[in-house]
Amino acid sequence: MVSYRATTETISLALEANSSEAITILYQVLEDPSSSPEAIRIKEQAITNLCDRLTEEKRGEDLRKLLTKLRPFFSLIPKAKTAKIVRGIIDAVAKIPGTTDLQITLCKEMVEWTRAEKRTFLRQRVEARLAALLMENKEYVEALALLSTLVKEVRRLDDKLLLVDIDLLESKLHFSLRNLPKAKAALTAARTAANAIYVPPAQQGTIDLQSGILHAEEKDYKTGYSYFFEAFESFNALGDPRAVFSLKYMLLCKIMVSQADDVAGIISSKAGLQYVGPDLDAMKAVADAHSKRSLKLFENALRDYKAQLEDDPIVHRHLSSLYDTLLEQNLCRLIEPFSRVEIAHIAELIGLPLDHVEKKLSQMILDKKFAGTLDQGAGCLIIFEDPKADAIYSATLETIANMGKVVDSLYVRSAKIMS
């Protein structure tokens, strides 16, 4: 069997070989016992090439084993280079679909190793990555516990760049847990830390994106739109895939402030045309349904673009609210001509299941959206006329108020006379 040494010629040979042969050659290069500066440099190249090859073949488990195998090599190179290689391999595993659990395992192993080796700088960054993965995996309690400890440690060391990342993660985590005050507080902390240093455009875009999400959650869609626009510009300039999500949320804000007619114009703009695809098609379908006040079109959009609408938690929160509003408007319009009507007839007119319509009408009555009652025995909705306020009540209140003023005035005058 041919043995390959850590030389430039071997790297060139690996680059020319097919994937399987290249992987074998590169593994042998890493096993070369030589620790000369040249051999170390060649091994670093071999690690990069091997990562690329294993990622292409979607061999995530082999990447995890590679990271374990490289631990003795890490003692020969500077800590900064070790950190770069470790993060590079974790990033390589992340490129392989369906490896979230593997990434979590890998990060936990690396946290243990970095703790044993007292590599604080690398450990903190791997822990931040682990917290993000746990949040993605909906393991919120574990992620929050990890972040709570990490943020205190990083704040003490005053590593502001990492602190921005951690505060942003904490904001996203609290938002996922529906704790808006804490999400806003963490975002404010991230902005404060970011103001003291130079923040890379990608990180600034992430801050703007999170700001837009929180403003939209508070129904401040105009401010949310501004932040989403800033995030879109940052991500678009970098070619970051998050640009399409920023644009999608911009369109969502337009729909929520009843400016659905602007959606088509934004999509057909020079910037929008770059991102034409299912996400923008979904928002266009929702905008069309909203413009036409059509529940049928709205439901068709939710069905046809389930992945883009219902599976996106940000969009889903707002569209469920929009759907309720649209449903209420349609029901009010349909029952307006009647004083008594069968619920089945309303359900037929609106094209929704009977029990769904009955439940919604009951909720609207309780919320005082209209005056009425449900006769469930007869399966009817009885609508009452809006009670007209008797003018005598307002006149009586006005008279009492005037009498109060007179009494107060008399009291003041008598007090002056007595003094």
UniProtKB/Swiss-Prot annotation:
GO terms for biological process: protein catabolic process. Residues 217-388 form the PCI domain. GO terms for cellular component: nucleus; plasmodesma; proteasome complex. Component of the 19S regulatory particle (RP/PA700) lid subcomplex of the 26S proteasome. The 26S proteasome is composed of a core protease (CP), known as the 20S proteasome, capped at one or both ends by the 19S regulatory particle (RP/PA700). The RP/PA700 complex is composed of at least 17 different subunits in two subcomplexes, the base and the lid, which form the portions proximal and distal to the 20S proteolytic core, respectively. Interacts with CSN1. This is 26S proteasome non-ATPase regulatory subunit 11 homolog. PANTHER family: 26S PROTEASOME NON-ATPASE REGULATORY SUBUNIT 11/COP9 SIGNALOSOME COMPLEX SUBUNIT 2. There is a cross-link at K160 (Glycyl lysine isopeptide (Lys-Gly) (interchain with G-Cter in ubiquitin)). Ubiquitous with highest expression in flowers. Belongs to the proteasome subunit S9 family. The gene is RPN6. Keywords: Isopeptide bond, Proteasome, Ubl conjugation. Component of the lid subcomplex of the 26S proteasome, a multiprotein complex involved in the ATP-dependent degradation of ubiquitinated proteins. In the complex, RPN6A is required for proteasome assembly. InterPro entries: 26S_Proteasome/COP9_Components, PCI_dom, Rpn6_C_helix, Rpn6_N, TPR-like_helical_dom_sf, WH_DNA-bd_sf.
